[in-house]
Design a protein with these regions (language model features):
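Positively charged n-region of N-terminal signal peptides that target proteins for export
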Residues: 2-10
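Beta-propeller folds
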Residues: 13, 22-314
Length: 314
C-alpha cells in the first residue's frame, strides 16, 4: 500500500510537470529575423553560399544586437516556467558539497585542488607535509570579478624557484601564461599572450611554449589559426624577444608542443593533427644549433619518451 501511495504521488507530480510543460509549449515564440548576406565561397569550382557569415564577427554591433534579441526570446520563455526557481534551488543544494582533488607532490610540498561547494573555480592549496596546515597557493576566483577566468595548468620550474600557470578567459581556447615566485607568491612581469594548446616547459632560466601569431584586432575569436609555433621565453624579458624554436609552414594546420627531460638535456617535439597520434622528434640541448632528429614520423600511434639515461632515450 505504501508503494502504491508513493507511486501515486510520483505520478501526480509528473503529470503536473507535463501539464505545465504543455502550457509552456502553447506559447507562440516569435523569433527575431536573421539577416542574410550575399557571401559565397568557391571551392574547386563549386559555389558554397554562407549567408550567415556576418555572425562570425562576434565583436560587431550587428552581432551583439542579434544575440540580445535572441536572448530576450529565450529568457522571456524560461522566466514563465513555474517550477524554475524550485529546480534551481534543488540543483544548487545537490552541487553544494566540498570537492577535493588528488594531491600531488612537487619539490617536497603537497598540492591539491579544493572547491568549498559553489565556487566558480577550484582553489589550489599547498601544505609543507602530509599532516601540515593547508594554505591557499593560487585562487583563480580572484583573477576576475565574475569568476570566469579558469586555471588551465600549473607548471613548476625544475629548481622550484618559479611557478608558471596558464589561464583561459570566459571559456576561450586562447591561453595566457603568467609566472610567480613560488616561495613568496609574488606575480612577476613575465606574461605570454596568444598561446594555445600548450603548457610551460621549463629549461634553464626560461620555458618553452606554443602559440600562434597575434590575430587581427577584433577577430580574436574568428580568425583561422594557422602555423602553430614553439617559442622559448627567457625570464625577465618581454614576449617580443622570445626565441622562435620551431615552425613548419608546409603544414599550417598541424600542432606542435614541447617537453624537456628531467636533466634538461633533451628537448622533445610533438607533432600532431593528421592522425590519431603524434610524431616525435628530439633535439640535444647540450649541442649548440643541434637540429631536431626524427624518432617517429607516423601519426597513427601516440609516442612519448619515458626516460633519458645516458645516451639512450626510452
Amino acid at each position: 500500500l505504501l508503494y502504491m501511495y508513493n507511486m501515486k504521488k510520483v505520478t501526480l507530480f509528473a503529470t503536473g510537470i507535463i501539464m505545465m510543460s504543455c502550457a509552456q509549449q502553447q506559447q507562440k515564440l516569435t523569433y527575431p529575423e536573421t539577416a542574410k548576406v550575399d557571401t559565397v565561397d568557391v571551392y574547386f569550382g563549386t559555389e558554397v553560399p554562407d549567408p550567415y557569415r556576418w555572425l562570425e564577427n562576434d565583436t560587431s554591433a550587428a552581432t551583439a544586437a542579434w544575440v540580445e534579441a535572441q536572448n530576450k526570446v529565450t529568457n522571456d520563455y524560461l522566466s514563465k516556467i513555474p517550477f524554475r526557481d524550485a529546480l534551481l534551488k534543488r540543483l544548487t543544494d545537490v552541487a553544494n558539497y566540498e570537492k577535493i582533488g588528488t594531491p600531488f607532490k612537487k619539490h617536497g610540498k603537497y598540492y591539491f585542488y579544493k572547491n568549498d561547494g559553489l565556487q566558480n573555480q577550484s582553489v589550489l592549496y599547498v601544505q609543507d607535509s602530509l599532516d601540515g596546515e593547508p594554505r591557499v597557493f593560487l585562487d583563480p576566483n580572484k583573477l576576475s570579478d565574475d569568476g570566469t577566468v579558469a586555471l588551465t595548468g600549473i607548471y613548476f620550474s625544475n629548481n622550484g624557484k618559479y611557478t608558471g600557470y596558464t589561464i583561459a578567459r570566459s571559456g576561450s581556447d586562447w591561453q595566457e601564461i603568467y609566472v610567480m615566485d613560488t616561495e613568496t607568491g609574488k606575480l612577476l612581469d613575465d606574461h605570454i599572450e596568444w598561446a594555445k594548446f600548450t603548457g610551460a616547459t621549463w629549461q634553464g632560466d626560461g620555458f618553452y611554449y606554443s602559440a600562434y601569431d597575434a590575430p587581427v584586432k577584433g577577430k580574436e575569436f574568428s580568425n583561422v589559426n594557422e602555423n602553430h609555433k614553439i617559442y622559448y621565453h627567457k625570464m625577465g624579458t618581454p614576449q617580443s624577444q622570445d626565441k622562435l624554436v620551431y615552425q613548419n609552414q608546409a603544414y599550417p594546420k598541424r600542432f606542435y608542443t614541447a617537453s624537456v627531460n628531467e636533466d634538461e638535456t633533451i628537448l622533445f617535439l610533438y607533432e600532431s593533427g593528421d592522425g590519431r597520434g603524434n610524431a616525435l622528434y628530439m633535439k640535444d640541448l647540450r649541442k649548440p644549433n643541434a637540429p631536431f632528429v626524427a624518432m617517429a614520423t607516423d601519426m597513427d600511434y601516440t609516442y612519448a619518451p619515458i626516460e633519458v639515461i645516458g645516451d639512450k632515450i626510452y
